[in-house]
Swiss-Prot record:
Function comment: Mitochondrial membrane ATP synthase (F(1)F(0) ATP synthase or Complex V) produces ATP from ADP in the presence of a proton gradient across the membrane which is generated by electron transport complexes of the respiratory chain. F-type ATPases consist of two structural domains, F(1) - containing the extramembraneous catalytic core, and F(0) - containing the membrane proton channel, linked together by a central stalk and a peripheral stalk. During catalysis, ATP synthesis in the catalytic domain of F(1) is coupled via a rotary mechanism of the central stalk subunits to proton translocation.
NCBIfam families membership: atpD
Enzyme Commission designation: 7.1.2.2
GO BP: proton motive force-driven mitochondrial ATP synthesis
Protein name stated in the entry: ATP synthase subunit beta, mitochondrial
Superkingdom of origin: Eukaryota
Main location: mitochondrion
Taxonomic classification: Eukaryota, Fungi, Dikarya, Ascomycota, Taphrinomycotina
InterPro entries: AAA+_ATPase, ATP-synt_VA_C, ATP_synth_F1_bsu, ATPase_a/bsu_AS, ATPase_alpha/beta_chains, ATPase_F1/V1/A1_a/bsu_N, ATPase_F1/V1/A1_a/bsu_N_sf, ATPase_F1/V1/A1_a/bsu_nucl-bd
Subunit structure: F-type ATPases have 2 components, CF(1) - the catalytic core - and CF(0) - the membrane proton channel. CF(1) has five subunits: alpha(3), beta(3), gamma(1), delta(1), epsilon(1). CF(0) has three main subunits: a, b and c.
Gene3D superfamilies per UniProt: 2.40.10.170, Bovine Mitochondrial F1-atpase, Atp Synthase Beta Chain, Chain D, domain 3, P-loop containing nucleotide triphosphate hydrolases
GO cellular component: matrix side of mitochondrial inner membrane; mitochondrion; proton-transporting ATP synthase complex
Enzyme class, spelled out: translocase
Encoding gene per record: atp2
Length: 525
């Protein structure tokens, strides 16, 4: 009896204590990182005062650094940047990821932690990582924290912006559909890109994602005339170097005059913290041109999978329980926070082209599958098509676009794209019969379908200007008008007499006719 009374008394006391705690607990307001400076002004009276908030390094484990501050009231906020002064006037930036108790914050380093020791002084900057933005970034190469890495002196910044920001509000966004012409036949005809949209370039290793992106920069950046921001996320340093030199040769970057592109790199050799944040750095540079200057900006990200991969590494370093296939549990949140910032507003637009590496060619892998949800158009590069020697190796049946609407494209373009895909699908279904029984067992109608489909398949190939050094074939940029006319003539049977080889690696149908004449002359000789 006494035992029961004691237990009920403990339960009543626990419940009363819990209710009292809930009533008296201080609820912190939900703050966006756009208002970080304002939040720190409340806490420290000024951002400058926050800079006097000093701590010291308590523990270093790889890219994770624990920093201890004097008292709990002076702890830096989550996502704040901390600075460590290193020899030779260098600085190491740490980003706060967790509050772990005992006046200690756990941070992720944006560079190597070699040489760090316990007790080294750390300064709270009072805001997230801030980078230089404005016209001064054009023609320059920056790293994740906005430092120039092209050995051409400091960047002349209009202002400094934090890399963590809110997406534009619903009222600010614009939704007028407009086609972005690329000059690449297979894209413009079957999966056209939206101006101010998000485009995904999916493919496994070595199918031509980077070459495709470089061709898009070459075609669109020149014709488009606006500003471009190229963000290299966890890819090869050699490719970044090649791109920089090519941009100088083509005049997109001028060392003396006015450049049209800014480059931001966090390559394969960088720590996971840098690779997980460099995409946000590039996006922040693009947002300035959209929001302040009202420009239509092109944002190229190569490779968005490395952003997810780096996030997974950071998550594991912080001790979070992994999700499916070992990815971070916050995969969808991380991706959504970044992708929602890439949009068209009433002031300007950001059109983004993102290369997406597909691990083991598996499109159901959580990383590419999460990216799919945010895209307006998907261009899938297929290994089976690249094995046929058809480049760009775009899968015409797997690539999709929300712009495939007769109200946007017009009836002629929409119907032609449907007819081309139908013919290729019929050819695909007949391939098994051909492999077993041969062409002779097909009906006359099926034989004609196969012949035209093979010509269409070869005609979807195109010589690229950036690949001219490998192929020896001059690059071709084909207008949408010529693309529609060319495919219409092939489907109508106007070029049934031409050999299949005449349609391979040419621009418009006129080039195919000239190539056929050249082949005929060579055979006659």
């Amino acid at each position: 009896m006494l035992k029961k009374q004691a237990l009920s008394g403990i339960r009543r006391f626990s419940l009363a204590t819990k209710q009292s705690f809930v009533k008296t607990s201080y609820k912190l307001p939900r703050k966006s990182w756009l208002n970080t400076a304002k939040f720190n002004t409340i806490r420290y009276a000024s951002t400058e005062a926050a800079k006097h908030n000093k701590g010291s390094i308590k523990q270093v484990i790889g890219a994770v650094v624990d920093c201890q501050f004097e008292d709990a009231d002076s702890l830096p906020s989550i996502l704040n940047a901390l600075e460590v002064k290193l020899p030779d006037n260098k600085r190491l930036v740490l980003e706060v990821a967790q509050h772990v108790g005992e006046n200690t914050v756990r941070t992720i380093a944006m560079d190597g932690t070699e040489g760090l020791v316990r007790g080294t002084a750390v300064i709270d900057t009072g805001s997230p990582i801030s980078i230089p933005v404005g016209p001064g970034t054009l023609g320059r190469i920056m790293n994740v924290i906005g430092e120039p890495v092209d050995e051409r002196g400091p960047i002349k910044a209009v202002k400094y912006s934090p890399i963590h920001a809110d997406a534009p509000s619903f009222e600010e966004q614009s939704t007028t559909p407009e086609i972005l012409e690329t000059g690449i036949k297979v894209v413009d005809l079957l999966a056209p890109y939206a101006r101010g949209g998000k485009i995904g370039l999916f493919g496994g290793a070595g199918v031509g994602k980077t070459v495709f992106i470089q061709e898009l920069i070459n075609n669109i950046a020149k014709a488009h005339g606006g500003y471009s921001v190229f963000t290299g996320v966890g890819e090869r340093t050699r490719e970044g170097n090649d791109l920089y030199r090519e941009m100088q040769e083509t005049g997109v970057i001028k060392l003396e005059g006015e450049s049209k592109a800014a480059l931001v790199f966090g390559q394969m050799n960088e720590p996971p913290g840098a690779r997980a944040r460099v995409a946000l750095t590039g996006l922040t540079v693009a947002e300035y041109f959209r929001d302040i200057e009202g420009q239509d900006v092109l944002l190229f990200i190569d490779n968005i999978f490395r952003f997810t991969q780096a996030g997974s590494e950071v998550s594991a370093l912080l001790g979070r329980i992994p999700s499916a296939v070992g990815y971070q549990p916050t995969l969808a949140t991380d991706m959504g926070a970044m992708q929602e910032r890439i949009t068209t507003t009433k002031k300007g637009s950001i059109t983004s082209v993102q290369a997406v590496y597909v691990p083991a060619d598996d499109l159901t892998d959580p990383a590419p599958a999460t990216t799919f949800a945010h895209l307006d158009a998907t261009t899938v590069l297929s290994r089976s098509i690249s094995e046929l020697g058809i480049y760009p190796a775009v899968d015409p049946l797997d690539s999709k676009s929300r712009m495939m609407d007769p109200r946007i494209l017009g009836e002629e373009h929409y119907n032609l794209a449907g007819s081309v895909q139908q013919m290729l699908q019929e050819y695909k279904s007949l391939q098994d019969i051909i492999a077993i029984l041969g062409m002779d067992e097909l009906s006359e109608a099926d034989k004609l379908t196969v012949e035209r489909a093979r010509k269409v398949q070869r005609f979807l190939s195109q010589p690229f200007a950036v690949a001219e050094v490998f192929t020896g074939i001059e690059g071709r940029l084909v207008s949408l008008k010529d693309t529609i006319r060319s495919f219409k003539e092939i489907l109508e049977g106007k070029h049934d007499s031409l050999p299949e080889s005449a349609f391979y690696m040419v621009g418009s149908i006129d080039d195919a006719v000239k190539k056929a004449e050249k082949i005929a002359q060579e055979l006659a000789a």
